[in-house]
Amino acid sequence: ELLATRVWVGVSAGSMVTGPDLLLRTSQIVYGEDLNRSEEMQALGLVDFYVLPHLNSQFFEKVRKEYIDEAVKVTDKTLYALDDQSAIAVLDGKREVVSEGVWHVWNEK
């Protein structure tokens, strides 16, 4: 209800929790964190796609297109990888990437 009259700004993991679930298998591969879990965890479900932030960041060596190309094979949902100069605006169900940097999309529908 609130999203109809408010703006959600998700930064870093705050953008990841907006999707249908946390896409743990992919996240564990590209972020290199072993969360000691294999089952999915529900996210907020505000959008029907996934976001992987920090594309090409010096702090996350596997958040690169070549790693994500492999890791994304576990889902058929749309996934965006965004660098720190990129964002996704969603208005009336329409997505628009706003970027002065680099971003990629997989399984675009």
Regions found by a protein language model. Give the residues of each.
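Catalytic nucleophile loop
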Residues: 2-21
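C-terminal and late-domain segments of enzyme folds
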Residues: 22-109
